[in-house]
């Protein structure tokens, strides 16, 4: 009995210790871009060199549930306190992992708007410890970026937003069921119904099978926990959402996102929706518009902390 109590106490203390360490920065290493990388990006983003001149970039390692997890950080070089954005990547494992090219183009762009931007590779990826679960315990790797930001001098942690793309949209929805600290969130081409996803793309079944614990024993249950359309009412109501969707997206069917819009509307969740005609998964054809609406939304509800208007029927 004494041994059992001692063991239980040891486990409890280990958990408490791990939780206390969440977000601790293990490494923050400056990222230097090769001239060839900048030149390549300048073909699509002419101001790439200006981003490098105005924004600091870092590769990071931080603690999440006792695991060393890798990611990236970007922030304006100019002194000051800035609102923050947690960026949630898409893909799985090394597919669509964050890389120097993407970080300069996307995280650098958002940082240049006047934000501290941090993104996780999720556990088990890019040299990180553990194993990702495609919407399981790896959601904590996002949540633990909140205490991570408290260690960044330029970060104003009273103003944190979130921005997720594709699988990162699913991760954003999941994170928003567990925290009310996010002032607003943007979801681009966001996965919201795993059943539609596996029906439209049967190959995704193998991804779930390889990454999701309990998949073979209880497929419907684990897919439902990764399908926000089934628990849209659990998403924090004080976090306004901007959903971006392209009508020609084959990776995440517009059906998923339209269904999610309806569920959010039914639950009177503060919501804005942009549907881009002919837009593919990346919405690259509408890049300028996407940047414009995303920046305006984040500036309004994260930077400026604007209050969402009444959702009840009103007016003349």
Tell me the role of every PLM-derived stretch.
Residues 35-79:
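N-terminal cap/lid segment of alpha/beta-hydrolase-fold proteins
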Residues 80-82, 87-130:
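Short substrate-entry loop that stabilizes the transition state in hydrolases
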Residues 97-98, 190, 195-234:
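Mobile cap/lid helix-loop segments that gate and shape the active-site cleft of serine hydrolases
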Residues 133-153:
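Alpha/beta-hydrolase active-site loop
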Residues 169-180:
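Short glycine-enriched nucleophile-adjacent loop
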Residues 242-245, 249:
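Short beta-strand/loop motif that positions the catalytic acidic residue
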Residues 250-256:
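Conserved alpha/beta-hydrolase "acid-adjacent" motif
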Residues 258-316:
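C-terminal catalytic histidine-bearing segment of alpha/beta-hydrolase fold enzymes
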């Amino acid at each position: 009995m004494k041994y059992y109590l001692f063991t239980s106490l040891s486990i409890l203390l280990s958990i408490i210790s791990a939780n206390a360490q969440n977000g601790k920065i293990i490494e923050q290493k400056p990222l230097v871009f090769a001239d060839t990388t900048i030149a390549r990006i300048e073909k699509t983003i002419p101001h790439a060199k200006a981003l490098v001149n105005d924004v600091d970039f870092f590769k990071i390692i931080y603690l999440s549930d006792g695991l060393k997890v890798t990611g990236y950080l970007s922030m304006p070089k100019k002194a000051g306190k800035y609102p923050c954005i947690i960026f949630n990547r898409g893909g799985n494992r090394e597919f669509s992992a964050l890389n120097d090219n993407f970080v300069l183009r996307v995280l650098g762009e958002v940082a240049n708007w006047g934000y501290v931007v941090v993104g996780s590779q999720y556990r088990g990826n890019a040299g990180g410890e553990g194993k990702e679960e495609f919407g399981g315990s790896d959601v904590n790797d996002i949540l633990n970026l909140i205490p991570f930001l408290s260690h960044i001098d330029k970060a104003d942690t009273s103003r944190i937003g979130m921005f997720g793309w594709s699988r990162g949209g699913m991760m954003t929805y999941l994170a928003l069921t567990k925290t009310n600290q996010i002032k607003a969130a943007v979801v681009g081409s966001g996965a919201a119904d795993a059943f539609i996803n596996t029906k439209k793309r049967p190959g995704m079944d193998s991804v779930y099978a390889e990454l999701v614990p309990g998949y073979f024993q209880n497929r419907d249950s684990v897919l439902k926990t990764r399908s926000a359309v089934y628990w849209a009412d659990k998403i924090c109501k004080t976090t306004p959402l901007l959903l971006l969707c392209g009508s020609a997206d084959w990776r995440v069917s517009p059906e998923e996102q339209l269904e999610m819009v309806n569920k959010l509307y039914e639950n009177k969740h503060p919501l804005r929706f942009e549907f881009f005609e002919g837009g593919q998964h990346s919405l690259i054809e509408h890049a300028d518009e996407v940047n414009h609406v995303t920046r305006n939304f984040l500036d309004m509800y994260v930077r400026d902390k604007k209050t969402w208007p009444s959702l009840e029927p009103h007016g003349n």
